[in-house]
């Protein structure tokens, strides 16, 4: 089934059993496949198109949302840490967490008068390709999903102005009686950087109720630290762990 999906994506009409080749990472495999797609003019050569295509490929290998959620619950029955260990590894294996790109970040520690600081220079996000910028300028504006932290991103094919999410599988959570989602960041700034977001696209603010929500999250995931960036003008309502 997976083979046939990939053959369809790559416009292949026949298949021959290949010789076994070892790769060092999923990035090497995807780069080779995407290079083939560019060579055969299946997609244009640009950073955005390459990301759209490699995410589409990994979506084929990603379990259905109910399967991923069931596995998380199974692990959670052992311990919250076992559940997040599994989910983070799964997010790396399906390339939602871009492990290879995150490794490019420059990190170091600095002993300041206020304590030890972790400093990061983010080099993991690819540079904007001029071809993508020009194409996005002329692209039809759409409002679905409403933002990059909406539950509707699950399985979304993506556009030149909105990243593909075929390999995204958020874990449903109930926080303060409302439905929320839990996922890792594709480009984490720190270890197991994750996000908890409201299932509804609504503005958030810092008030007394927020602290109750933060405590709910730490009750469910006691080995994580959580904070809120809700009032920041460039950030939609979410909690960072």
Predicted regions and their residues:
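Active-site microenvironments that recognize anionic phosphate/pyrophosphate groups
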Residues: 1-208
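A short acidic-Thr-Gly-centered motif at the start of a beta-strand
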Residues: 174, 216-220, 231-232
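Histidine-centered divalent-metal-coordination microenvironment in nucleic-acid enzymes
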Residues: 193, 198, 228-241
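Long, well-ordered alpha-helical scaffolding segments within enzyme catalytic domains
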Residues: 206-223
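Short C-terminal domain-edge/linker segments immediately following a structured domain
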Residues: 148-154, 212-215, 226-228
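Beta-sheet entry/capping signal
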Residues: 179, 223-226
């Amino acid at each position: 089934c997976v083979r046939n999906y990939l053959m369809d994506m790559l416009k292949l009409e026949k298949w021959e059993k290949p010789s076994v080749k070892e790769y060092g990472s999923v990035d090497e495999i995807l780069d080779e496949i995407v290079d083939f797609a560019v060579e055969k003019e299946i997609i244009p050569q640009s950073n955005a198109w390459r990301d759209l295509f490699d995410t589409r490929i990994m979506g084929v290998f990603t379990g259905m949302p109910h399967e991923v959620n069931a596995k998380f619950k199974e692990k959670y029955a052992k311990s919250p840490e076992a559940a997040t260990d599994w989910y983070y590894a799964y997010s790396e294996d399906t390339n939602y967490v871009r492990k290879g790109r995150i490794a490019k970040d420059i990190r170091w520690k600095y002993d300041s008068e206020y304590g030890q600081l972790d400093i990061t220079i983010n080099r993991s996000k690819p540079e904007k390709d001029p071809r993508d910028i020009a194409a996005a300028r002329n692209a039809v504006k759409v409002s679905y999903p409403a933002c990059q932290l909406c539950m509707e991103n699950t399985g979304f094919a993506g556009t030149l102005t909105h990243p593909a999410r075929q390999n995204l599988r958020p874990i449903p959570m109930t926080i303060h009686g409302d439905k929320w989602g839990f996922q890792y960041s594709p480009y984490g700034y720190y270890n197991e950087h994750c996000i908890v977001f409201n299932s509804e696209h609504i503005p958030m603010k810092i008030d007394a109720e927020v602290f109750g929500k933060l405590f709910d999250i730490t009750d469910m995931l006691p080995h994580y630290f959580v904070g809120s960036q809700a009032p920041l003008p460039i950030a939609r309502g979410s909690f960072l762990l």
